Regions:
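Acidic, glycine-rich A-domain
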Residues: 6-7, 17-23, 27, 31-34, ...
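Short coil-to-beta-strand
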Residues: 2-12
Length: 162
């Protein structure tokens, strides 16, 4: 009997944005991520899926909030993952509430706003948090720059055979 190594990928979807962002961006980008996850899992690659609903800076403080949506062994349950992956309220209401009530957020600038989106500044979440080698972060803005093309997203995750 030979044991097979199971391929795994961790995806962290960053859904922060500035106040002028249209809700359609999150809906379309979230749908593309879920389409990519379905494709990857059909290729027998296990996915850990997290959403980062806050990735911003104010003064010298950086706020990062992530929530695990699906673990490697979990089946993809669209009923469970659609809200956190594609609904604007996940970022706007739950993300804002997190920043408003987090006890370690001390910088005065947070009181007059919600900080500056780091993903819009072209920063990668993986620059700020420790992740395994097989982890990828992608933002709604990156997906928009990829023309909401699932093939380009899969290439970003190195999931297509060359």
């Amino acid at each position: 009997r030979t044991t097979q190594k199971v391929k795994v990928i961790e995806i962290i979807y960053v859904m922060d944005a500035n106040s002028g962002t249209e809700k359609e961006l999150w809906i379309k980008a979230g749908a593309i991520i879920l389409e990519a996850v379905k494709f990857i899992e059909r290729a027998n690659i296990r996915i850990k899926l997290s959403v980062c609903m806050y990735f911003a800076k104010s003064g010298n403080e950086i706020a990062i909030s992530t929530v695990k949506i699906k673990d490697f062994g979990d089946k993809l349950d669209l009923q469970k993952v659609c809200f956190p992956m594609a609904h604007p309220s996940m970022f706007r209401r739950i993300g804002f509430r997190w920043i408003e009530t987090h006890p370690d957020i001390k910088e005065y600038g947070w009181s007059s706003g919600y900080g500056r989106s780091l993903s819009e500044d072209g920063k990668e979440l993986t620059e700020y948090i420790k992740t395994p080698v097989h982890a990828y972060s992608i933002s709604a803005h990156q997906i928009k720059k990829m023309d909401f093309d699932v093939i380009k997203v899969l290439n970003h995750f190195n999931c297509l055979k060359k």
